[in-house]
Amino acid sequence: MSDFVQQQSVECCFESSESWVILSPIEQSIKRKIESIGTPLKDWDIQINYGIKTGFNDAFIISTEKRNEILDNCSSDEERTKTAELIRPILRGRDIKRYGYDWADLWLINTHNGIRGVKSRIEINDYPAIKAHLEQYWDKLSTRADKGDTPYNLRNCAYLDDFNKPKIVYQELTQGCAFALDKNGDYIVSNTAYLITGKNINYLIKLLNSKVIQFAYRHFYGTLLGDNGLRWLAQHITKLPIPKYNGTEIQNRIIGQTEENNIEESIYQLYDFTKEEIKHINKI
């Protein structure tokens, strides 16, 4: 037994501040390279937040058919216009794919609670057609925990305006990487998804969707679900060491490339991985 242990053992270095993870020599080398040139996302100029929590989705997340019905019930063109502006397309976690999304024709009635000192909360009496719709669910709305100043309003959300910005959106539970770019800030996301706003997201999304980061999250930084599942929690994503954008030739190439194999190859070059390390990463 002692001979077997000596033959099969690997030397690992443990930092007292980190969780203990047993890594093979090649995995230790990969981790060292990732951390030597990467900066944890918590030190980037970005913000990661979860999607909107309504407290009762049946009332606030509606189909296109229901949206049109509400708009048809508006008593004036003015009410119809401002009501249409308040009802926003929404993505659920399951709608978000790698580099894209399949919008399910769902909308959020965004009767937000305002932002203190910045934006007033929605006054429901200014939206009679929406009020009539929500009153059908009064018993549920009035007793739910996640509500604003009135049962008609959504809970406080300090980053409400971030939904209007260009952003990366992603779902929490996946089998791999599933990050998509909402270039124009068109969508709100539900509480089964997250959003990332800030600088250089066109570059960041290429790294987040890469095999390198999927490997690193799975083996070093993330939370596993069963044999293949990943849970992309914000507190773990912020640990990911990714090279900050400095306008290098390789980084600009990564941004400009659209072919997946070319993107992956450039990212391998960015981290200076050997052929053996690349082969090991590709086993995921």
Where are these regions (language model features)?
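Conserved AMP-binding
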Residues: 264-284
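Extended amphipathic alpha-helical segments enriched in small hydrophobics
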Residues: 236-271
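Polybasic, glycine- and aromatic-enriched phosphate-binding surface used to engage nucleic acids
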Residues: 3-6, 10-249
